[in-house]
């Protein structure tokens, strides 16, 4: 394998995240994000390891209009997934991502997902990126 064991480990999806695959797949389809199910599960893995009531850590995102916009404000995993998918789709669109193989744009979108897409892209624009 071209990756060291350590990197491979970091990219593995645990059982808790894998258990959400069907739900993530069906929700992703509603937002034309079916090609990104593995990426979405990787985001979930990174954000929460599939634990808790806000597995996508999307409480503070723009799409959360039902729960407090504070860490772990969302108490419904399904709603967290829906918000997280919309947030990532928005970030991918803003990054100009052309598809699941456009890794440089995906990296940009993932950074935007973490920092909040609008403020992140505004920051890049202001700093000439």
What do these predicted regions represent?
Residues 3-129:
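Catalytic glycan-binding domains that act on GlcNAc-containing polysaccharides
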């Amino acid at each position: 394998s071209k990756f060291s064991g350590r990197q491979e480990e970091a990219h593995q999806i645990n059982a808790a995240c894998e258990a959400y695959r069907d739900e993530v797949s069906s929700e992703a389809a509603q937002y034309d994000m079916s090609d990104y199910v593995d990426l979405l599960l990787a985001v979930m893995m990174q954000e929460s390891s599939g634990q808790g009531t806000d597995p996508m850590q999307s409480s503070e995102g723009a799409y959360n209009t039902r729960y407090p916009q504070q860490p772990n404000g969302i108490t419904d995993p399904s709603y967290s997934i829906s918000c997280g998918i919309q947030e990532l789709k928005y970030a991918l669109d803003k990054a100009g991502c052309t598809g699941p193989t456009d890794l440089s744009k995906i990296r940009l979108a993932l950074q935007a997902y973490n920092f909040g897409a609008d403020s992140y892209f505004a920051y890049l624009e202001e700093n000439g990126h």
